[in-house]
Amino acid sequence: MKNYIEIVDVYARQILDSRCNPTVEVEVELEDGTVGVAAVPSGASTGAFEAVELRDGDKSKYLGKGVLKAVDNVNTIIADELVGMNVLDQVAIDKTMIELDGTDNKAKLGANAMLGVSLACAKAAANSLGMSLYQYIGGVNAKVLPVPMMNIINGGKHADNNVDLQEFMIMPAGAPSFSEALRMCSEVYHALKSTLKSQGYDTGVGDEGGFAPNLKSNEEAIVVIIEAIKEAGYTPGKDIFIALDPASSEIFEDGKYNLAGEGRVLTPEEMANYYVELAEKYPIISIEDGMAEEDWDGWKILTEKIGNKVQLVGDDLFVTNTERLSKGIKLGVANSILIKLNQIGTLTETLNAIEMAERAGYTAVVSHRSGETEDTTIADLVVAVNAGQIKTGAPARSERVAKYNQLLRIEEELNDMGEYRGLKAFYNINK
């Protein structure tokens, strides 16, 4: 096998994401003519501690959201350093970009510029070696197909309705395989559409393909999903479980949680009790960002109350950052990390966060962003690291479906070697 393949060109362009906002796409060409292409996603509800997504700020173009500065950084500063380097040395590539940037949060070059290059290099390397991306990143033991965490009702910043919690999801942990899990989710999605229509609700969809009905309360969203699970012929709490992403940083004001849609303002202790009640009443297996990103005390309360039986995922809390994750592990808060490549900005830093989480007994859930592209890197990544869980939207909208379809291809390629762990993917809780 080759051990040195030279990078001969690094080129970026501005393209559009699924929310009609500009984003960065990067092509990396190698000495043998092989090319790797990667497009970068973008979030709507972003954590305050995420790496910087460089935007142009020129209001006369794309409402200030252009990424031509980031593109230029790739085509000049980054390309000048990386051309001539060995594409197989991912650690050196990412380290070089981190040093070129020189800031704690990628503010100079932009995490969107750096991530595009980092992923395009990995893809070019895999292509040159004739390997699948998941095999290249994960090696010979990359084999676990993930349980989908599928967003089917949107609220909060992902939808224009009065539901406070941002995402209501289903997880087919009782399925025997990934393809069967996907089928189950698809059937529940269709059943939910029919259920909402029959009750007079709108069936327009949000950024991630989930429905965005103007429901009366957060709890009603859970109830209507449970109806849909049953309508599709499955058993809630056995075949399919519920997962929530309240995105609590978005509703945290002056030390309290404002559930405006329900006309309630709760203290951290009361908010924790709110989740306890929901988890006792419904088959909730996972709650993401149940508390705000800087409410460490609230997180501690929530973890002590239900951290042994519900997966508590830190997204805004950890932002795929080993420093923040390390603090959380020491404090004993949460038991899982959401992995978003663009929160940190390079592939190797992402892999470091996953490794740290797993060493501490935390699960890692690989995730999309609300602004996505047709890029399917996260489908390969989740299998590469055997994470066992993926969050990439509803089984609708082609930028979401692209990831599921890639996982179907990987499942087919792995054949008998592939594993779908179902409930065993939740090694962080008592089931």
From Swiss-Prot:
Record's signal peptide: none
Cofactor(s) the record lists: Mg(2+)
Molecular function per GO: magnesium ion binding; phosphopyruvate hydratase activity
Catalysed conversion reaction: (2R)-2-phosphoglycerate = phosphoenolpyruvate + H2O
Cofactor note: Binds a second Mg(2+) ion via substrate during catalysis.
Keyword Magnesium: yes
A GO cellular component annotation in the UniProt record: cell surface
Main location: cytoplasm
SMART domains in UniProt: Enolase_C, Enolase_N
UniProt cross-references to PROSITE patterns, sorted A to Z: ENOLASE (PS00164)
Keywords: Cytoplasm, Glycolysis, Lyase, Magnesium, Metal-binding, Secreted
Subcellular location: Cytoplasm; Secreted; Cell surface
Residues the entry annotates as binding (2R)-2-phosphoglycerate: 166, 340, 369-370, 391
Active site, renumbered: 208, 340
Annotated residues for binding of Mg(2+): 245, 288, 315
Any GO BP annotation: glycolytic process
EC number: 4.2.1.11
InterPro entries named in the record: Enolase (IPR000941), Enolase-like_C_sf (IPR036849), Enolase-like_N (IPR029017), Enolase_C (IPR020810), Enolase_CS (IPR020809), Enolase_N (IPR020811)
Function description: Catalyzes the reversible conversion of 2-phosphoglycerate (2-PG) into phosphoenolpyruvate (PEP). It is essential for the degradation of carbohydrates via glycolysis.
Protein name as annotated: Enolase
Species annotation: Clostridium botulinum (strain Langeland / NCTC 10281 / Type F)
Originating gene: eno
